[in-house]
Amino acid sequence: MTVDRRGFLGGTAAAAVGGTAALALGAAAARAENTPAIGKFAFPDTERLRVLVTGDAGTGARPQWQVADAMREQHAREPFSLALALGDNVYEQGPWADDDAQFAAKFEDPNHDLDFPWLMVQGNHDNSSILPGDGGWLLRGDHEVAYHARSARWFMPSRYYSVRIPQERPVVEFFVLDLNPVAAYLPPLFQPYWAADGQFMTEQAAWLDRALDESTATWKIACTHHPYRNNGPHGNAGEYDGFGIDPIDGRHARDFFEAHVVGRCQFLLSGHDHSLQVLEPTPASKGTRQIISGAAAKSVHGEPSSGSKNTPNGALYENYNDLGFMVLDLTPMSADLGVYTVDLSNGQSANVFQRKLG
C-alpha cells in the first residue's frame, strides 16, 4: 500500500483444484469465460506444511526479484508447500483484464520455479480507480479472480474463499477475505452492493461465520490485505492513517474483524503496511495473533508513524526498513514462524526471527 489517506484527501466459479485440499467459495465467485484450461499446481496432502508468507509484492521491479531470488534459495534448501500472497498483487493500478501482461511481469516471471499453489488476497492497489491504491474500482479486482483460470500458480477462485489442507483431518484451514469495500480510500458511497451493510459484505460475513463454525482444522488462519492491528504507518483498523473520518479510517473493517474473525482464528495474516511485524495478541483480539508481511517489494523506510501512535501494540518483532518475507511451519502440534530479510546490496537473506507461536 503506498497511497496515504491524508494525501489522497488533500489531492482529491472455480477452476479445478489439484491435490487433496478442500475448497469453499464465497458467494461472489466469478467465472472466467473463453480462457484456456490450465492445470493447477496440486496442494500438499501431508500433515507437515511449510508456508511462504509474502505481501505487497507486485511491482515487477528489481527489489521484488531480489526477494523472490531469496525465496527460491529457501525453497531449494527446504521446499515450500504453498504460498500466501497478502494483496497488492499488481501495482500500481491493478490489472485491466484477465489477460493483462502485468500478470506475467509482476507475478509469473518474478516467481518462476516457485511451483506450488499461491493463495492470493486482493489489495487496494488491485482495485484502483482514480489514484493508484484508492481502492475505488472494486470491479477491477474481478480480473484477478478470472486470472485464476489462466495460471497454474495463481489461486483466487473467488474474492473470498477458504482452503483446508489436507481435506481429511485438516492441519490448517486458510480463510482468505476481501475487506477492500470497507477499507477503500475512495469508498463506494453510491454503490449499495459494496456498502458495509450491503450484499457483498453481508454475504461474506455469513459465509465466514458458517465456514469457521464447520471447520475441523487444527489451525485456523485468516488472510487479509488490510490488518486489524498494526504498528506501522497505516495504523490499526478504525484508526487507519490517523484520519478519523467514517468510513476511510477503517472502522467498518475493525467491526468486521471483531464480529467475525478475532477469537476464532489463531492467526491473522495481513499485508498493506510495507513492514514485517509479529504482534502480541491483545484483549481486543481475544487471543488471535496479528502478523504483517507486506515488505516483499517495498519498505516504509523508518520508524512507525501516523495512526499507529494512537493505539500501539506489543510486538515480538518489528522491522520497518528491510524487505523480506516469512515462513510458517505447521504440524498438527506446532506453528513455527521465521522472518527473513533480504540485503538488496548483495541479495543475501538472513533469518532474523524464529519462534514457536503455537
Predicted stretch roles:
Residues D56, G87-D88, G123-N124, L177, ...:
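Active-site glycine-centered loops adjacent to acidic/histidine catalytic or metal-binding residues
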Residues V339-G347:
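Short, solvent-exposed aromatic-acidic interface loops
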Residues V51-V53, A83-A85, M120, A222, ...:
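Residue-level marker for buried hydrophobic side chains located in beta-strands
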Residues L25-N34:
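C-terminal region of N-terminal signal peptides and the immediate post-cleavage residues
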Residues G39, F43-D45, R72, Y91-K220, ...:
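Extended active-site neighborhood of metal-dependent phosphoesterases/phosphodiesterases
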